[in-house]
Regions:
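Transmembrane helical cores of multi-pass secondary ion antiporters/exchangers
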Residues: 1-431
Length: 433
């Protein structure tokens, strides 16, 4: 009960100062990670007795599913259709190059890892974190086209990483994952079923919520509970059919808007807050785990972490964005702000649950921890200054620059819209991809 009491007390204190904290460079993940690190010495006995990777996995999975669903439900579908080429580039060329380059660098930095173990490490660290990137995607100072692209990328790349991760685990273990016949079949199950589950739950759930609201069957408080049940339903059904719960949650969040347009403006706030609570709990637990393993963090882990956050992320993004006419400032901004956090923690726990005691297991675990830890601080502390610098850079661009083309027609946010969000009505201005 001591860790829970400390966490809840910190959560309450942080909520009292949250508006002030949002005006600083110290983010909530930094606060709760540091708190976990500071509390570890007093909780060592408790952690050894009761802290398990399986328990942390469930907390992290639920937190990430909630966050992905709420992010997707707040994504403007009109703008999404206009920027489809940017997320497609980041999720295809960008992600594949990130996994390949990450594996190559891992083999160079950690020669003791096999090729497949290097692939495991790369797949765990390939996805970006929607939670750590919230400051970016919620800032009206960042062009809509850029932040929506980063939001969609973060929402989908963790789910897309899962098949690669489990395939590398299967190859490293020299056997087929779960008896499935091929990588193609497994990808179809994870991604294809994930999309189908998300579409079914999102469309049906949105239609039923809208029907209940129009018929005045549903109370406002239970309208919120109805929305929060949808991402949890995505999680449960995905687990039952062997689909990616992360893909299902994000697709479900997009689909729910079709039948229930108010999902992203009002009711989703309940789901978002609970998702945020779970995310902060994960960072708190991660901070304790990081201190526990700190003596094992060698120089190679720090070198790989630095390369993973810079070269391994930024070079593939730059290649993927060739031909978009985006400025160098935008390419660098999108390349740098691909933080590693909750998604990598979840995938790391999936790996620890699935792994067959590979020789490089500890090397992979420590490298993931160091990379996430470095990202929490580096991306958190650089977010506000980075937005300010980027804002000045794009202000000097011509009016027809690709960065500006989706921000031509903007209105004041309607009642109920969260602070930092804007509403784009429609923009018929064409842009080059």
């Amino acid at each position: 009960m001591i860790p829970l009491a400390f966490f809840v007390s910190l959560l309450f204190l942080y909520s009292l100062l949250s508006r002030r904290m949002e005006q600083t460079i110290v983010t909530a993940p930094i606060v709760f990670t540091v708190a976990g690190m500071l509390m570890f010495p007093a909780l060592q006995g408790i952690l050894k007795a009761g802290f398990t990777a399986n328990a942390a996995l469930h907390v992290a999975e639920v937190g990430l599913v909630m966050l992905l669903f709420t992010d997707a439900s707040r994504t403007d579908l009109k703008v999404l259709r206009s920027i489809k080429t940017l997320p497609a580039r980041l999720l295809s060329t960008g992600m594949l190059l990130t996994i390949v380059l990450g594996a190559v660098v891992a083999r160079l930095v950690f020669p003791q890892l096999s090729l497949w173990e290097a692939g495991i490490l790369s797949a765990i660290l390939a996805p970006t974190d929607a939670g750590l990137g919230q400051i970016i995607v919620n800032s009206p100072r960042v062009p809509m086209r850029i932040r929506q692209a980063l939001n969609v990328e973060a929402g989908l790349n963790d789910g897309l990483s899962v098949p690669f991760l489990l395939f590398f685990i299967a190859m490293a273990a020299a056997k087929i994952v779960g008896g499935r016949g091929s990588l193609v079949e497994f990808i179809v199950e994870q991604l294809g079923f994930g999309v189908l589950v998300g579409l079914a739950i999102g469309l049906a759930g949105g239609w039923l919520l809208d029907l209940a609201r129009r018929k005045e069957w549903i109370a406002e408080s239970f309208e919120q509970i109805g929305v929060v049940a949808l991402p949890l339903l995505c999680l449960v059904v995905s687990d039952m059919v062997g689909a990616s719960m992360f893909i299902a949650a994000f697709v479900g969040g997009l689909a729910v808007q079709i039948g229930f347009k108010e999902a992203g403006k009002h009711s989703v706030e309940f789901a978002e807050e609970w998702g945020q609570l779970l995310n902060l709990a994960v960072f708190f637990l991660f901070g304790m785990a990081a201190v526990r393993d700190w003596p094992h963090f060698g120089a190679a882990s720090w070198i790989y972490a630095l390369l993973s956050l810079t070269l391994v992320r930024m070079l593939p993004v730059a290649i993927a964005l060739i031909g978009t006419r985006l400025s160098a400032a935008s390419v660098i901004f999108m390349g740098w702000f691909g933080p590693r956090g909750l998604a990598s923690i979840v995938l790391g726990l999936v790996y620890l649950e699935q792994q067959a005691h590979f020789p490089g297991e500890s090397t992979i675990r420590f490298a993931v921890q160091v990379t996430v830890l470095l990202s929490i601080f580096a991306h958190g502390l650089s977010a506000m200054p980075g937005i300010g610098l980027y804002e000045r850079k794009i202000a000097a661009l011509p009016a027809d620059a690709p960065e500006h083309l989706n921000d031509q027609i903007v209105t004041a946010a309607p009642a109920g819209t969260r602070e930092g969000e804007i509403q784009v009505l429609d923009s018929t201005v064409p842009f080059s991809t």
